[in-house]
Amino acid sequence: MWKWETENDAKGVVVIAHNILEHTGRYAYVITMLRRNGYHVIMGDLPGQGQTSRAQKGQIDDFNTYHENILEWIKIANEYKIPTFVLGVGLGGLIILNLLEKTELPIEGILLFSPMLELKR
């Protein structure tokens, strides 16, 4: 997990959950833009992804492993005592929505980009 702080007066903190088989490095531009616009950013590589150590990339034993990571990042974000938002992309969006089904999160809002969802008619 990494933290990037804005050099401006902070408006809030954004916790980012990336897509499947991605890593933090792919979000350099997003992180830069958020910081430039007054937001701290907290993000890490999800278990089995990026620079995490797994024999088989993308493999986890339990989906709750993702929840534990996101909850820890949100806890750290809330230490700033300013509004916390979560941003989920693809798998990250699915993780956040699944987590919201199970528990109330201490956040001000969510942003979802192409969350992995199936909509039933």
Residue ranges and their predicted role:
Residues M1-E5:
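A short loop-to-beta-strand scaffold at the N-terminal edge of the catalytic core in hydrolase folds
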Residues K11-N19:
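Short beta-strand element of the alpha/beta-hydrolase
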Residues V13, H40, P83-F85, G109:
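Structural signature of beta-strand start/N-cap positions in the alpha/beta core
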Residues V89-R121:
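Alpha/beta-hydrolase-fold enzymes
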Residues L21-T24, G50-Y80:
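Catalytic nucleophile-loop/oxyanion-hole region of alpha/beta-hydrolase
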Residues R26, I31-A55:
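Conserved alpha/beta-hydrolase
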